[in-house]
Amino acid sequence: MVTQIISTMETQASNGPGSVGILNGTNGAADDSKTNLIVNYLPQNMTQEEFKSLFGSIGEIESCKLVRDKITGQSLGYGFVNYVDPNDADKAINTLNGLKLQTKTIKVSYARPSSASIRDANLYVSSLPKTMNQKEMEQLFSQYGRIITSRILVDQVTGSVSRGVGFIRFDKRIEAEEAIKGLNGQKPLGASEPITVKFANNPSQKTGQALLTHLYQTTARRYTGPLHHQTQRFRFSPITIDSVTNLAGVSLTGPTTAGWCIFVYNLSPEADESVLWQLFGPFGAVTNVKVIRDFTTNKCKGFGFVTMTNYDEAAMAIASLNGYRLGDRVLQVSFKTSKQHKA
């Protein structure tokens, strides 16, 4: 397999790299992380030896790790490579990013350093003009820094009309802070009222209860009763994120091409996509949400799906939201398995 991979790599290298790195990788990494790479969307049957051989063909590797599920031992579809020489890391990005392996197109980018400068850079924006699209929102915010992801919530019925609410994730917190200073309370072109720009609450802080209470209050018209966490039934340590699959009680099927699919159960009949966006958006980049509806009544059948691009953020969302009470219902949140309901 390795020989075929390297042959494919040499054929594709002349075409240049593929699309840019995803959320948890950036070509603007700090100097102390110029050798450390994250590799996403690897074929699930790829072994540690094949992974090392592929990236070892570029240059000397100090360490590499193919990340596996703690329970099943199956590859989670991503890994880390640390080169001795920064030039080799740069070459690996230019050569291997966008390489097609089997049915996958791998993404190679610098692993983002774990520092306060890149944490908590996710913004919640409301009262946007209904005519503003995602590109226009990015243009409005891009003057303050590099945007990693953005999303505007749309009406479920039309699938296109904006709800006037969006999320913007910057590369660095200081950029997000500047965006708040510059845009919060301002009226962009086409707006009938000032927009609100604020940080999406950080789930890693000791304010998880306040976060979900706030989220519940935003949807209070659809739900009744307070929001509570079932602390006696569901507990977790924020530092043991790898144990989330044990908490959820399921094994993973691995990421989809779009990211990690999360199953959300026990939603009320009145729940819609905006509820899922507001619940999961603050935890990280969400690429898609879907509430499963009854064809006759168009009411929620009690469950839905959320896709997030980053495993750690998805795991944190599960650990924080599994067992929380939304209205009079206790949510059950886990990674989607093949045995669960299908849309």
From Swiss-Prot:
Lineage: Eukaryota, Metazoa, Chordata, Craniata, Vertebrata
Free-text domain note: RRM 1 and RRM 2 bind cooperatively to AU-rich sequences in target mRNAs. RRM 3 binds to poly-A mRNA sequences.
Origin: domain of life: Eukaryota
Family matches, as CDD domains: RRM1_HuC, RRM2_HuC
PROSITE patterns per UniProt: RRM (PS50102)
Family from the record: Belongs to the RRM elav family.
UniProt keyword annotations, A-Z: Developmental protein, Differentiation, Neurogenesis, Repeat, Ribonucleoprotein, RNA-binding
Entry's Gene Ontology molecular function annotations: RNA binding
Single GO biological process annotation from the record: cell differentiation
InterPro entries found in the cross-reference section: ELAD_HU_SF, Hud_Sxl_RNA, Nucleotide-bd_a/b_plait_sf, RBD_domain_sf, RRM_dom, RRM_dom_euk
Protein name: ELAV-like protein 3
Chain's gene name: elavl3
Domain RRM: 35-113, 121-202, 260-338
GO CC annotations on file: ribonucleoprotein complex
Entry function: RNA-binding protein that binds to AU-rich sequences (AREs) of target mRNAs. May also bind poly-A tracts via RRM 3. May be involved in neuronal differentiation and maintenance.
NCBIfam families per UniProt: ELAV_HUD_SF
